[in-house]
Curated annotation (Swiss-Prot):
Its main location: membrane. Residues 31-49, 100, 158-163, 237-251, 301-308, 364-369 are periplasmic. This is Inner membrane transport protein YdiN. Gene3D superfamilies: MFS general substrate transporter like domains. The lineage of its organism: Bacteria, Pseudomonadati, Pseudomonadota, Gammaproteobacteria, Enterobacterales.
Length: 421
């Protein structure tokens, strides 16, 4: 596949389908949390009960992610993306009509399965469409997720203030997924192979990657990065109400600030990652910023700190470092992008399953301990990002025509080693 073909009209339709699906995925991730009060009343439960319900999303990801990685590599990207859309349709149309918590949990599992299918189809497809700019391509996924997460809290707040039935907030995304289905059926996807001429312009391996070191560190980074922003998405409104004295409508808007922050980061780094900054540098910087911010949110809770903190966490932890982690791990292990993505995201699914259970328990003890947990995850992300950063420049030789910010000394050292060898 040539780089020019990636921009032809048939592939652009496929790219639009993927990005639009991630916009709606962003909504699906926070739907249960944003409607926590309405759903708790509907199912006669409390916040911990809805946290249990949310854990079904993680279970769905956990049980399906490896399966879809194999399917994506064998049968193609479009097939698994279509499977994802079907699962999303079941969730959005099913929750409003769901009679009990048990069935709702099954629908939450469907969202997790849908996310697995979308990730193992969408990420590899985007990297295959834009092999020279895979970092920018995958980080824009986060932009679309953030658009969805910025829009949806505003919709929920509007419906809450105007006494509109919460179910309309699920039916509308369901209708949009029907439109995506029609678009997917007409779209074409690129080949799973990349031209050798393109590959030669990318960083070349100087030594064999170590699965037990950079492989494990990359996966742990993904878990920590996911958990850092996931905790904020679910629990920041409740924390802001309890410790900053904010009303429910005001507290829900913290997630809009969070999404705005992630969008700002996405567009800044989408530009920087093309030629100026390599993803591993972005991951170290952003995880350090998230660690500092989580500490401030815990130590100095106030409306200003909660709103600003949500924005900065959105910028740092949710601004695409999870997606960049996938891109970096695919560089270390490039032979099977979907399988790499599935392993990486499987651990995120494990976190998606376990973290709601832990935070649900902590919510009964004290919401402040949830923020302490968030700080711990941010710190783990920083430590593992530094490990991957160090290993990257030991494994790869940076081409002279692709030296980026801060890399000159690394590039010179590694090229010297190569010539001596």
């Amino acid at each position: 596949m040539s780089q020019n073909k990636a921009f032809s009209t048939p592939f652009i339709l496929a790219v639009l389908c993927i990005y639009f699906s991630y916009f709606l995925h962003g909504i699906s991730v926070i739907t249960l949390a944003q409607n926590m009060s309405s759903l708790a009343e509907k199912f006669s439960t409390d916040n911990a009960g809805i946290a249990y319900l949310i854990s079904g999303i993680g279970l769905g990801r956990l049980i399906s992610i490896l399966f879809f990685g194999v399917i994506s590599d064998k049968f193609g990207r479009r097939a698994v993306i279509l499977m994802a859309v079907i699962m999303y349709l079941l969730f959005f149309f099913g929750i409003p009509a769901c009679p009990n918590l048990t069935l709702a949990y099954g629908l939450a599992v469907c969202v997790g399965i849908a996310n697995s299918a979308l990730d193992t189809g969408g990420y590899p497809a985007l990297m295959e469409c834009f092999p020279k700019a895979s970092g920018s391509a995958v980080i824009l996924v986060k932009a679309m997720v953030s658009f969805g997460q910025m829009f949806y809290p505003m919709l929920v707040s509007y419906m809450l203030l105007n006494n509109i039935w919460y179910g309309y907030g699920l039916i509308i995304p369901g209708i949009l997924f029907v439109l995506i289905t029609l678009m997917l059926l007409k779209s074409k996807f690129p080949s799973q192979l990349v031209d050798a001429s393109v590959t030669n312009e990318l960083p070349q391996m100087n030594s064999k990657p170590l699965v037990w070191l950079e492989g494990v560190s990359s996966v742990l980074f993904g878990v920590a990065a996911f958990s850092t922003f996931y905790v904020i998405v679910v629990w920041m409104p409740k924390y802001a109400m309890a410790f900053a004295g904010m009303s429910e409508a005001e507290a829900l808007k913290t997630i809009s600030y969070y999404s705005m922050g992630s969008l700002v980061c996405v567009f800044i780094f989408a530009a920087l990652l093309k030629k100026m900054v390599r993803p591993i540098w972005a991951n170290v910087f952003n995880s350090a910023l998230a660690t500092i911010t989580a500490a401030i949110i815990y130590l100095y809770p106030s409306p200003l700190v909660c709103n600003a903190g949500a924005f900065v966490i959105g910028f740092s932890a949710a601004g695409g470092i999870l997606q960049l982690g996938v891109s970096v791990m695919s560089e270390f292990f490039p032979k099977s992008k979907a399988k790499v993505t599935s392993i990486y995201m499987m651990m995120g699914g494990l976190a998606n399953f376990v973290i709601p259970l832990i935070t649900g328990y902590l919510s009964n003890i004290g919401l402040q301990y949830i923020i302490v947990l968030d700080f711990t995850f941010a710190l783990l992300a920083l430590i593992t990002a530094i490990i991957v950063f160090i290993r990257y420049y030991r494994v790869f030789i940076i081409p002279e025509n692709d030296v980026r910010f801060g890399e000159r000394k690394f590039c010179t050292r590694l090229n010297t080693i190569k010539h001596r060898g």
